[in-house]
């Protein structure tokens, strides 16, 4: 139990220190906590994130006990933030934290927003007034590119070139087409290429043709695909 108490204490220590650090570094004037609810996506696609349930079911008895203590501590932390500070705490029974963050950004278009998360999906929200900070990698993602803690541009480890600024529209389009294995979402077009060939249209060509909706847009996916469960 003492070992578990130490883990919980360290987790709270790291959490509060992290909040203080980003508050000071980014000169914040308000903090918003967005919490998970049951996703509405499960009502439309039952297998959504089922793989995570499988992982939970495989936990040992000790891991289950530790998780119970963790969630009890989390509830206390949430109540403290909600009742004893001026932070905003958002939660909805059918929305994920991602949905709430996107909604907050969209409903406050005149404010500058810093999303503190390691989740790559938030690159879809990047805009002149929206940046993301990955505290693990110490990387800031803005509409101008990726920057390290010293303000230098981050280079792609594979190409050695500077990582270009994310294109939110492209990222959303690619995610919709390729699916997301981490969320157990099947690809809408299995095996689709990023760049097309002489005989097949790729994602890049279709994306470039999305406004005029010409040949590439209408000929990228000529079949209907279903996953192994018939969705």
List each model region and its residues.
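Accessory alpha-helical DNA-binding modules that contact the DNA backbone or grooves
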Residues: 169, 174-231
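A short, charged helix-loop
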Residues: 139-188
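Noncatalytic, basic helical substrate-engagement surface that gates or grips nucleic-acid strands
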Residues: 1-116, 122-147, 160
């Amino acid at each position: 139990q003492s070992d578990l108490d130490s883990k919980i204490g360290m987790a709270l220590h790291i959490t509060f220190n992290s909040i203080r650090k980003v508050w000071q570094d980014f000169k914040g004037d308000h903090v918003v906590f967005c919490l998970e609810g049951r996703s509405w996506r499960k009502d439309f696609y039952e297998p959504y994130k089922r793989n995570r349930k499988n992982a939970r079911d495989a936990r040992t008895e000790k891991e289950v006990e530790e998780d119970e203590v963790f969630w009890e501590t989390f509830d206390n932390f949430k109540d403290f933030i909600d009742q004893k500070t001026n932070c905003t705490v958002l939660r909805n029974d059918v929305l994920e934290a991602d949905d709430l963050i996107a909604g907050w950004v969209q409903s406050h278009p005149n404010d500058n927003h810093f999303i503190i998360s390691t989740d790559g999906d938030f690159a879809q929200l990047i805009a002149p007034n929206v940046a993301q900070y990955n505290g693990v990698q110490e990387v800031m993602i803005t509409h101008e590119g990726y920057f390290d803690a010293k303000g230098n541009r981050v280079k792609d480890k594979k190409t050695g070139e500077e990582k270009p600024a994310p294109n939110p529209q492209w990222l959303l389009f690619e995610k919709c087409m390729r699916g997301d294995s981490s969320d157990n979402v099947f690809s809408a077009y299995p095996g689709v290429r990023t760049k097309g060939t002489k005989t097949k249209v790729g994602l890049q060509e279709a994306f470039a043709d999305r406004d005029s909706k010409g040949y590439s847009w209408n000929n990228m996916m000529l079949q209907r695909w279903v996953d192994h469960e018939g969705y």
